[in-house]
Amino acid sequence: MKALRAVLLILLLSGQPGSGWAQEDGDADPEPENYNYDDDDDEEEEEETNMIPGSRDRAPLQCYFCQVLHSGESCNQTQSCSSSKPFCITLVSHSGTDKGYLTTYSMWCTDTCQPIIKTVGGTQMTQTCCQSTLCNIPPWQNPQVQNPLGGRADSPLESGTRHPQGGKFSHPQVVKAAHPQSDGANLPKSGKANQPQGSGAGYPSGWTKFGNIALLLSFFTCLWASGA
């Protein structure tokens, strides 16, 4: 009996340190796992920084925002675009009405944009895209926009025509009308211009002979009447 008790006591004493080591091993295992998670987070931050360099310092895109704007009206509203909307869009629509054609302008931020020109139901729509700040400004509101000939869009060209190569105005040439020659080539031979020919001024041709005959007939008639 004493021997059995001694064996049990030895087993109990030897089992306690083993359980303690096992518990210590279980506590020590999570530490390397937590360390690995920290390394993964650092790697993700490095990847995000490499994918978008300088994104923190970049100012957000701003676009003009007007839903319905008529020609000549000013658009005074702007909006800051999110990173998912990198385009400023301008939509111009031309539609026919009872009073003629009506043109409206719409502008805003968008995520995708493609320049198009199409006609839907008698309305022609023109869509333009740009990616710089306030680039979708109405053409009449921007004094820097120039027309293809070199003049500004909000004012007509000055006198003269702009040369396509030199970029300067070339005034039109003045052509003088050639005066008629004074040698009388276009005048009648026997008189001046705008006057009938013949000896009597202001009478048609042959009037002198007819007048003489008429006078003679009148004279003979008077003699016949007096003789009778």
From Swiss-Prot:
Residues 199-228 form a propeptide. Residues 21-32, 145-200 are annotated as: Disordered. Glycosylation of Asn-76 is critical for cell surface localization. It is found in: Apical cell membrane; Basolateral cell membrane; Cell membrane. Induction: Induced by fasting. The keyword Disulfide bond applies. Disruption phenotype: Adult mice display chylomicronemia when kept on a normal chow diet, with milky-looking blood plasma due to marked accumulation of chylomicrons in the plasma. Their plasma triglyceride levels are generally above 1000 mg/dl and can be as high as 5000 mg/dl. Mice display decreased plasma levels of lipoprotein lipase LPL. Contrary to wild-type, LPL is not recruited to the apical surface of endothelial cell that faces the lumen of capillaries, but is mislocalized to the interstitial spaces surrounding myocytes and adipocytes. It is a lipid-anchor; GPI-anchor. Residues 61-148 form the UPAR/Ly6 domain. Residues 1-22 form the signal peptide. It holds the Pfam family Toxin_TOLIP. GO terms for biological process: cholesterol homeostasis; intracellular protein transport; lipid transport; positive regulation of chylomicron remnant clearance; positive regulation of chylomicron remodeling; positive regulation of very-low-density lipoprotein particle remodeling; protein import; protein localization to cell surface. GO terms for cellular component: apical plasma membrane; basolateral plasma membrane; cell surface; external side of plasma membrane; plasma membrane. InterPro entries: CD59_antigen_CS, Ly-6/neurotoxin-like_GPI-ap, Snake_toxin-like_sf, Toxin/TOLIP. Mostly monomer, but also homodimer and homooligomer. Interacts with lipoprotein lipase (LPL). Interacts with high affinity with high-density lipoprotein (HDL). Interacts with chylomicrons. Interacts with APOA5. The N-terminal acidic region is intrinsically disordered. This region contributes to LPL binding. It stabilizes LPL and protects LPL against loss of activity. Mediates the transport of lipoprotein lipase LPL from the basolateral to the apical surface of endothelial cells in capillaries. Anchors LPL on the surface of endothelial cells in the lumen of blood capillaries. Thereby, plays an important role in lipolytic processing of chylomicrons by LPL, triglyceride metabolism and lipid homeostasis. Binds chylomicrons and phospholipid particles that contain APOA5. Binds high-density lipoprotein (HDL) and plays a role in the uptake of lipids from HDL. This is Glycosylphosphatidylinositol-anchored high density lipoprotein-binding protein 1. It comes from Mus musculus. The gene is Gpihbp1.
